[in-house]
From Swiss-Prot:
It is found in: Cytoplasm. PROSITE patterns: HTH_LUXR_1, HTH_LUXR_2, RESPONSE_REGULATORY. Member of the two-component regulatory system TtrR/TtrS, which is required for synthesis of tetrathionate reductase. Positively regulates transcription of the ttrBCA operon. During mice infection, the ability to use tetrathionate as an electron acceptor is a growth advantage for S.typhimurium over the competing microbiota in the lumen of the inflamed gut. This is Tetrathionate response regulatory protein TtrR. Residues 3-117 form the Response regulatory domain. SMART domains: HTH_LUXR, REC. One of its GO terms (molecular function) is transcription cis-regulatory region binding. GO terms for biological process: regulation of DNA-templated transcription. The gene is ttrR. The keyword Iron does not apply. The keyword Endoplasmic reticulum does not apply. It comes from Salmonella typhimurium (strain LT2 / SGSC1412 / ATCC 700720). Residues 134-194 form the HTH luxR-type domain. Residues 153-172 bind DNA.
Length: 206
């Protein structure tokens, strides 16, 4: 089950919000310090960070920057006071899914969480594909690119100046490493890896 990470230095807020989220059926973890969250939470799973904009030591923007830099698949929804709206909008430009003004009501919260969970699940799938892709050798990556473009084995052999049998061997390895059972699935995986719709905006790229 995806986890909702609730990060706010005000324990009264986290307790009240956690009670609400749990009553809606979500798995919730509460954090009061950004550094503790970054050190202890699983950052590469499907989930959402409900993130307070203003916190001591490491504020919401700092936590969001850290998540972007490490390529986390967690989606971020900011909780803001009225005066923080411009900052929250700026963070959305940097990849946050949404922002909600305090006090938060149920329907907007649930809608934002569902959008964020969809984004996070797609990011997890994309990250798994990227990890598979990173196992390919440079030659296998070149071959995979040609396969995805629809080149036949003989055309690949000519383009790469290798034997057709060598193409067949490399192609089989590419399919195995990319965990693709068919050419169509391999192409879909490359499309997912490249699609901005499956990407949480980060500094981590293949």
């Amino acid at each position: 089950m995806a986890t909702i990470h609730l990060l706010d230095d005000d324990t009264a807020v986290t307790n009240a919000c956690a009670f609400l989220l749990e009553s809606l059926g979500y798995d919730v973890k509460c954090w009061t310090q950004g550094a503790d969250f970054l050190a202890q939470a699983s950052l590469y799973q499907a989930g959402v960070v409900l993130l307070d904009m203003r916190m001591p030591v490491l504020d919401g923007q700092g936590v969001h920057d850290a998540l972007r830099q490490c390529g986390s698949t967690l989606a971020v929804v900011f909780l803001t006071g009225h005066g923080d709206v411009p900052m929250a909008v700026e963070q959305m430009k940097r990849g946050a899914v949404d922002f909600l003004q305090k006090p938060v009501s149920v329907k907007p919260l649930q809608a934002a969480l569902e959008r964020a969970l969809t984004v996070s699940s797609a990011a997890v799938a994309r990250r798994e594909i990227i990890l598979c892709y990173q196992q390919l050798t440079p030659k296998e990556r070149e071959l995979a690119s040609l396969v995805a473009k629809g080149f036949m084995n003989r055309e690949i052999a000519e383009a790469m100046n290798i034997a057709v049998r060598t193409v067949e061997v490399h192609r089989a390895r590419v399919m195995e490493k990319m965990q693709a059972g068919s050419l169509a699935e391999l192409i879909r995986r490359f499309e997912k890896m490249a699609s901005p719709e499956t990407r949480i905006r980060t500094t981590y790229e293949p």
